[in-house]
């Protein structure tokens, strides 16, 4: 296969994975599952798969798509804690844009793809090692998303997040948010 056709093939594969991320983001109850306090997400799954199949750079691009769709989704369909993910939703007790929400919405998602891609690349080999590398990359990618998003929420919006959920940071769930 020539270099040009290999490049085109890779670009098409990345575009298809990005389309899956966008599709999951905007189909109700598919990519974001509303829970009592926050929306659980499955959108990180194609980001991790893309990172495993296409590498850390592609994983970072897919993570960026995930982050941008998260901002859009939380802006057009706000929930109680959407101020953590959209600069257009003011945090309780604040007026005006909250630009730290862009850090929470985008940076961890980019790092999901980068981390998963590098873990896979470092661990992958033949046979069982490849399976282990896929599992490790999936776990690291999921943990990267959860831990960095929750830590960002605690760091930038801890009091507002606790207030939106009627839970002080000193309560056990507030402590869990801090511990993450």
Residue ranges and their predicted role:
Residues 1-180:
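Loop-helix junctions at membrane interfaces
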